[in-house]
Amino acid sequence: VSDVPNNDDRFTY
């Protein structure tokens, strides 16, 4: 996932 915003609350890649 390279289109992930600054949401470390949902995506923790």
Swiss-Prot record:
Keywords: Chloride, Chloride channel, Endoplasmic reticulum, Ion channel, Ion transport, Membrane, Microsome, Phosphoprotein, Transmembrane, Transport. It is a single-pass type I membrane protein. Major plasma membrane substrate for camp-dependent protein kinase (PK-A) and protein kinase C (PK-C) in several different tissues. Phosphorylated in response to insulin and adrenergic stimulation. It is found in: Microsome membrane; Endoplasmic reticulum membrane. GO terms for cellular component: chloride channel complex; endoplasmic reticulum membrane; intracellular membrane-bounded organelle. Its main location: membrane. Induces a hyperpolarization-activated chloride current when expressed in Xenopus oocytes. May have a functional role in muscle contraction. Belongs to the FXYD family. This is Phospholemman-like protein.
